[in-house]
Every structure is written in C-alpha cells, then in structure tokens.
UniProtKB/Swiss-Prot annotation:
One of its GO terms (molecular function) is structural constituent of ribosome. PROSITE patterns: RIBOSOMAL_S4 (PS00632), S4 (PS50889). GO terms for biological process: ribosomal small subunit biogenesis; translation. This is Small ribosomal subunit protein uS4. One of its GO terms (cellular component) is small ribosomal subunit. The gene is rps4.
C-alpha cells in the first residue's frame, strides 16, 4: 500500500530487461515518436496490456458457454471499454472486443498530443512538436496544453492549434511551418485533412520506363 499523497507508478517495467529484440523495438519507438525515454514506451505498453487483459476476460466469459453472449455487468464493461477506445481513436467505430487483442503500442502512441501536433502540420519534426507543447505554444479548444503525452480524443483533435498569445500565431514566425493545415470553420475542413492534402500534392511523381539501356558497340 502506498503512502497517502504519494504517486504510485502507472506503468510496469519489463520483466526481462535485457531482451535484445524488445530493446531494439523500444529504441525505434523512442526515435519515431520523439519520446524522452523508454519510460514513455512502457506507459503506453502498460495501458495497452490493461485493455487487452480486460478483453481476454470478457472473451473467456463468452467462451465459457454463457448463452446470449455478454449480459449484465459484463456487457456494460464491454461497452465502456469499446466506447473509450473509439472516442480516443485507438480503434475504429465498428470494432469489437476481438479487435482490442490486435492493437499494438503504436496505436496508443499515435494518439499522444505530441504526435497529433506533428500529424496536423503544426510542427516540422516530432521533437519540435514536443518543444512547442512544453513551452506553452499549443492549445486544445483554446486552453493551453503542456503535456506531450496526454491522449487526444477524436473530438479534441479537431480543435488543436496554437495558443492565443503564442508568437507562433503570427504566420511569419520563422519557427512556424508553412500553414496549409489551418482549421476552416466555415467549410468544415480540419487541420488533419489539409495536412493530408498537402502531402498528396507534394508526393513526387513516379518515373516510368525505368533506366534506358545503352546500345552496344558498333
């Protein structure tokens, strides 16, 4: 039992700390998502492990021969888990309990605020996205958000932008990326949609025909 007022760990460390394959995967995730250390990977993995454990218990209850599937408390628990994961965009709206077992750590890391700031085109790199957040330049629904690891719901994702008095609100700011991903309230275009459109326009055309063969000597 922890002391009152003392924060307990919200994650589990690996049981076998020196597994080469797992360590290599963790390093890749730290680099890809601009994480501060492996602890942030372990937090995401622990969260995923918790949901998968609950999903297995529910599936085991169904497999135990209960007629009519999930009922009562089990049905309510199943709906709550699915509703939360759908709300945060971790699974699709038509997903079921079985789909939770196929989730990966990356599915959790993709919903972090730091990742979403990069995906929406508000920062050039994932490291810059973290810097903008910790320095108070990013807001959700107009409220400053300074925690890079907070999970962002699909609804809040549409309202991520620069904080009200941040210098980055100025489009000529040297650290601000080229803004083609601005939220257009009148047309309903989101930052994400605009960013995806920009990526499609900048995709280089495929070269056809291959390399031309040189003719033989005469």
């Amino acid at each position: 039992m922890a002391y009152p007022g003392k924060k307990s760990k919200s994650y589990e460390t690996p049981k076998h700390p020196w597994q080469e394959a797992r360590m290599a995967t963790e390093v890749q995730l730290v680099k890809a998502y601009g994480l501060r250390n492996k602890k942030e990977v372990w937090k995401a993995a622990s969260m995923l492990r918790m949901y998968r454990s609950e999903a297995r218990k529910l599936l085991a209850h169904v497999a135990s021969g209960q007629e009519g599937g999930l009922e009562g408390h089990y049905r309510t628990q199943s709906e709550e888990i699915l509703s939360k994961l759908i709300r945060y965009g971790i699974i699709k709206s038509d997903a079921n309990i079985d789909d939770i077992l196929s989730l990966k750590t990356e599915n959790i890391l993709e919903r972090r605020l730091q990742t979403q700031v990069l995906r929406l085109g508000l920062a050039r790199t994932v490291i810059q996205a973290r810097q903008f957040i910790t320095h108070g330049h990013i807001a959700i629904n107009g409220r400053k958000a300074t925690i890079p690891g907070m999970l962002v719901s699909k609804e809040d994702e549409m309202h991520i932008g620069y904080y009200g008095n941040s210098p980055l609100k100025n489009e000529s700011h040297p650290e601000r990326p080229v803004q083609v991903a601005s939220f257009l309230a009148d047309s309903g275009t989101t930052l994400k949609a605009a960013a995806e459109a920009k990526q499609a326009r900048e995709k280089p055309p495929e070269r056809g025909g291959g390399r031309r063969k040189r003719g033989g000597r005469r």
